[in-house]
Amino acid sequence: MTSRYERQEKIGEGTYGVVYKARDTSTAATVALKRIRLDSEEEGVPCTAIREISLLKELRHENIVKLLDVCHSEHRLTIVFEYLDLDLKKYLDRENGNLDAATIQHFMRDLLRGVAFCHQRSVLHRDLKPQNLLISREKELKLGDFGLGRSFAIPVRKFTNEVVTLWYRPPDVLLGSMQYGPPVDVWSVGCIFSEMATGTPLFAGKNDADQLMRIFRFLGTPNNRVWPSMNQYPNSNNMLSQPEFLQNFEPEWSNVLGSVPGYEKLGCAGVDLLERLLRYEPSERITAADALNHPYFSLQF
């Protein structure tokens, strides 16, 4: 079966396995092959691969990368995806971080459509970041790399908290939250929205504590009013009793929005949407579906 695909060049390493650009000899289409080696000691296919396959088979949407085929041999599993040669990180770098207001709005709408579709189907992505958002020739943005994706249909399941690249990780996960739902992706969307506006990651932390500190400085030190569940996470006591977290930071939010170039491209409505995405309390973050109906998307740029 894999002989149908002519491998051309290695284009990256995914959550696991190697990704190649290839040609489908039966259609002449360019495709991406994600190859996963199956170690003889291991029983069957890595669970991350099975998770990605089963999720993507269910998720058919224009803003989600298409899974075209799955080839399985004794030593290797090959997942065939539509080929997109550009991700949002590369796109931002190419434009020197300077996207115009209309492009930001367009990408943001695509991102939220993909995320809302996942959430409607009880699927969390859990690793949203610019490198996992692919851009087509037609400038459509699509969610890719579902290696960490997880169905959340069973309500009170404990998830592992080793998810989401640090910079796009919400404060509840930084404090060790093991039970979370769609708000984990919504926080990441907020971070990506800000990065599209300014060209720079909003919270580029070096470790969990530094990441949380950057969030505290930006949003202000939380209290039980703005974050009722803040003391209920596994690492709350440990982390929040450190001297640096006992300082009272005034929010830098309005100063940053007023002084960092790029935020003006969002308009007042875009800034309001950003604030609703980046709430401390997970249940108070706007949903992806509600975000699509936000006045920001009525703005004409």
From Swiss-Prot:
CDD domains in alphabetical order: STKc_CDK_like
Presence of keyword DNA-binding: no
Pfam families: Pkinase
Phosphothreonine: residues bearing it: T160
Class in the EC hierarchy, top level: transferase
Record has Phosphoprotein as a keyword: yes
Example of a GO MF term: ATP binding
Residues annotated as signal peptide: none
Keywords: ATP-binding, Kinase, Nucleotide-binding, Phosphoprotein, Serine/threonine-protein kinase, Transferase
Active site (catalytic residues): D127
Catalytic activity line of the entry: [DNA-directed RNA polymerase] + ATP = phospho-[DNA-directed RNA polymerase] + ADP + H(+)
EC number(s) given by UniProt: 2.7.11.23
Regulation (activators, inhibitors): Phosphorylation at Thr-15 or Tyr-16 inactivates the enzyme, while phosphorylation at Thr-160 activates it.
Domain Protein kinase residue range list: 5-297
Gene3D superfamilies: Phosphorylase Kinase, domain 1, Transferase(Phosphotransferase) domain 1
Gene Ontology CC annotations of this record: cytoplasm; nucleus
Binding positions for ATP per the UniProt entry: I11, G12, E13, G14, T15, Y16, G17, V18, V19, K34
Function: May be involved in some stage-specific role in the promastigote cell cycle.
Subunit structure: Forms a stable but non-covalent complex with a regulatory subunit and with a cyclin.
Family recorded in the similarity comment: Belongs to the protein kinase superfamily. CMGC Ser/Thr protein kinase family. CDC2/CDKX subfamily.
Name assigned to this protein: Cell division protein kinase 2 homolog CRK1
Organism (species): Leishmania mexicana
